Amino acid sequence: MSAIESVMQEHRVFNPPASFAKTAAIPSMEAYQALCDEAAKDYEGFWARHARELLHWHKPFTKVLDESNAPFYKWFEDGEINASYNCLDRNVEKGLGDKTAIVFEADDGTVTRVSYQELLAKVSRFANGMKALGIKKGDRVVIYMPMSVEGVVAMQACARIGATHSVVFGGFSAKSLQERLVDVGAVALITADEQMRGGKALPLKAIADEALTLGGCEAVKNVIVYRRTGGNVAWTEGRDRSMEDVAAGQSDNCPAEPVGAEHPLFVLYTSGSTGKPKGVQHSTGGYLLWALMTMRWTFDIKPDDMFWCTADIGWVTGHTYITYGPLAAGATQIVFEGVPTFPNAGRFWDMIQRHKVSIFYTAPTAIRSLIKAAEADEKIHPKQYDLSSLRLLGTVGEPINPEAWMWYYKNIGRERCPIVDTFWQTETGGHMITPLPGATPLVPGSCTLPLPGIMAAIVDETGQDVPNGNGGILVVKRPWPSMIRTIWGDPERFKKSYYPEELGGKLYLAGDGSIRDKETGYFTIMGRIDDVLNVSGHRMGTMEIESALVSNPIVAEAAVVGRPDDTTGEAICAFVVLKRSRPTAEEAVKIAAELRNWVGKEIGPIAKPKDIRFGDNLPKTRSGKIMRRLLRSLAKGEDITQDTSTLENPAILDQLKQAQ
């Protein structure tokens, strides 16, 4: 049975606990419906009310939504705001200065607590130091850092002075970093000497140095280095400065720079189906509004909660639900440097027990790998830990299969914590379709219903609505405040990718297939409709990986597809033709290992193919088109049912069944 079939046949329903609903921000389906009705009746009024109630505006807005240059929508355009002010100063002014903002746990278990007052001072000193280096409003700053308080400080400091940050995940290669530095036109790079993961020190500064030698980065005048490990690193005088030195001697007071609501807060790169990563540009006002609204609605955040989102700041989840959302909500949160399996696979449960975490938000991939570990070793099974502080669980990054959902619900939530299975994307800025923990009856594997104000629908290839029970393409019918504004430097690609003419140019295309339940109308996400893979919740374009493989001097041709994987959700399977004869036996194993490392260096370790198969050539039609559906069947080990009569060389099918 496919994952989608198992969800569609899922009839178990779990109602919100009455005790949870009693104090929830949205306490019932009636309250949910009332908000949906308000948005349907007066869409602009609905968003304006929340924006005025929830955010501090340096200059109040009078315009709500400008659709005159659709699909380049503008929200609260004449208003002025500062994201850092809303996250830090406002909480200090409310009397929360002594409240813990961040509990940082390092890879080795060392714990550091930072209050809102201390965080504001750190951000202000570093922001003043950046200004002293000539970094100013409108400049772009790339951040290539480990999970750390300093990573959050760097992002908040950029927001404070009106510089646009672009965070690059610390697992990306020098080439990936260089591409992003060039594309966004960065004037500065903030990095660290090394990062700690699973007890090992891994280079960051060395990779950053390499990226800067690959060309096109002449605009980068300052490299600021956070000394995480104190490890020996190369130093370029006049360009390189330590983060400590930049902040040293600076004032604790750095007035927040008011920026227009549409000012780009950040650009975050995500994989596209054409190979070149897309710089997703987000606004300041609309983005921050939805980050805060979803903290209140989806996570039902309360003053005494201990919130923990296990994502990395290099991904959008770490932007919205670490750097901005929790701080805008005045919450206390965990920031974690390490990995879930070090020193053992009980690390997450141990941390929940020690820090009394009440809201836990992680990826299905992490859950699936920890299920395996728990079943293999009784000592680190979650039942050995006191998880009674938990009141809410969440999942993010990819759909969760009903079996993993049930394990999470029983073993971690002890059958008393609702699970918010959140569907959203880098491009949406925040949650789109998700249960509300005090209102929505839960069905394992379904992300249930759109949040109030989100006009999600399922359509066919022409943009027409399809009836419930029929699969189709997931779209959003109206613009919303936290949506992508454009692809950095490429407005045409933005239109083509997200507002295609085939759907009439007016519907936001999520790029996912979806289906709604006939009775409940609940949404289930079925996976990408384009050539984008979702591995451990990280999106990667097949073309990006193919290009990396083909850039190896021994590779003539490569095709990449995804196949289901019990742990990572989807695994990368590469079909490769070498410039010399097809390798077999030990030679094939050796070359496959070399190619994996090559891809790791070109893109980053997360892009390494799980299996590599060698053929004399690839299956193509007589017109020379690679038969990708056939490759998907081979990757999954399925019987070939496709018509192979147009196949140029049917003998290669047996070769391509052999995985290395």
From Swiss-Prot:
UniProt keyword annotations, A-Z: Acetylation, ATP-binding, Ligase, Magnesium, Metal-binding, Nucleotide-binding
Assigned GO CC terms: cytosol
Cofactor: Mg(2+)
EC number: 6.2.1.1
Keyword Ligase included in the entry's annotation: yes
An example molecular function term from Gene Ontology annotations: metal ion binding
Catalysis: reaction(s): acetate + ATP + CoA = acetyl-CoA + AMP + diphosphate
InterPro entries: Ac_CoA_lig, ACAS_N, AMP-bd_C, AMP-bd_C_sf, AMP-binding_CS, AMP-dep_synth/lig_dom, ANL_N_sf
Residue sites binding ATP per the record: G397, E398, P399, D421, T422, F423, W424, Q425, T426, D512, R528, R539
UniProt-listed GO biological process terms: acetyl-CoA biosynthetic process from acetate
N6-acetyllysine modifications at: K625
Similarity comment: Belongs to the ATP-dependent AMP-binding enzyme family.
Function in brief: Catalyzes the conversion of acetate into acetyl-CoA (AcCoA), an essential intermediate at the junction of anabolic and catabolic pathways. AcsA undergoes a two-step reaction. In the first half reaction, AcsA combines acetate with ATP to form acetyl-adenylate (AcAMP) intermediate. In the second half reaction, it can then transfer the acetyl group from AcAMP to the sulfhydryl group of CoA, forming the product AcCoA.
Name of the protein in its database record: Acetyl-coenzyme A synthetase
Originating species: Cupriavidus metallidurans (strain ATCC 43123 / DSM 2839 / NBRC 102507 / CH34)
Source organism phylogeny: Bacteria, Pseudomonadati, Pseudomonadota, Betaproteobacteria, Burkholderiales
